[in-house]
Amino acid sequence: MNKIDAIEMEQMKKNIPGFRPGDTVKVQVKIVEGDKSRIQAFQGVVIGRQNGGIRESFTVRKISNGVGVERSFPLHSPSIDAIEVITRGQVRRAKLYYLRKLRGKASRIKEKKYVAGM
């Protein structure tokens, strides 16, 4: 391992849950306004993950007051306080950009079901 990889490994977060496109996540983001800071939640569907390693980012989409809002987050950013997986979605694509065109019930994602005891 070279020096660049070693520096990247120490800066990567360790407590990131495993999530995939189609999952509904709640991202707790630190917002700094002047000398005050607070945590703001952004909950929506993961529509894609890009790159890998320290450069990895993901995009979350939600509908707010009838308007689609997408926000991209660097996965290992210090401004992300926590990522919580709400539901697991069952999709067959890595990028869910087709959700941008869908409205209402058509934009729902099927929930993944787990069988316990197998």
UniProtKB/Swiss-Prot annotation:
It holds the Pfam family Ribosomal_L19. GO terms for biological process: translation. InterPro entries: Ribosomal_bL19, Ribosomal_bL19_CS, Ribosomal_bL19_sf, Translation_prot_SH3-like_sf. The keyword Ribonucleoprotein applies. Keywords: Ribonucleoprotein, Ribosomal protein. It comes from the Bacteria. Disulfide bonds: none annotated. GO terms for molecular function: structural constituent of ribosome. GO terms for cellular component: cytosolic large ribosomal subunit. This protein is located at the 30S-50S ribosomal subunit interface and may play a role in the structure and function of the aminoacyl-tRNA binding site. Belongs to the bacterial ribosomal protein bL19 family. This is Large ribosomal subunit protein bL19. It comes from Geotalea daltonii (strain DSM 22248 / JCM 15807 / FRC-32) (Geobacter daltonii). The gene is rplS.
